[in-house]
């Protein structure tokens, strides 16, 4: 039985600027979640490269990549991903434990950010004792507590009602502005994309449009100083000709660890000058 190549992310290259709120928008199966996982170093590249603050994700081994994520990245998940045996305070402390901060300091930092997300009276509650919105607030606090440079959010409001969705989005946007952080959010909900400065539309593994939002929702949620400085000249995330191959045998999918760095920034097979937005690729084999 032969193999058929499926391009999960096909000919995609782009740059996300420092301090930018970028939304990757697409329907289920569009390749948006695969793209997010590649950017965050969760899935390995088959080809291409991702540069974050001048560091190549592709060149890092697992140990270096793990350290890089701990020091630079935060994550907000659709399913919250809280540890049920731990309190809100203990869940938020976890990233600080991995950074080997002293117990007293990490508790102070965790308490401070839980108060900022409106959970000052829920610190000793476990996930099952909180609503979905409260659990996601804990997740947001955990993502921001270690002061990452970039926060990746994968369908952060997927399990929430419309009212709580607005509250969570305003919380993420406000904290990003006040701390001058970069946000990369994946969603299928076009209404959430209105909070973003840049919207990358993805369909069938390809970028169909890159839209710039001059009047994003929540622009007034940060301080005036933070809002004026959200966009910087320094590119923070650059994706170059990404490819990721997966092979299927009797419908079983396994990831490929093999990869290469492409220096060609133009269309496949053509030499091009570096630009901020280009085509990028991610392949799956079936």
Q: What residues fall within each predicted segment?
A:
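ABC family nucleotide-binding domain
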Residues: 1-202
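Serine/proline-rich low-complexity intrinsically disordered segments, especially terminal tails, linkers
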Residues: 15, 30-32, 220, 258, ...
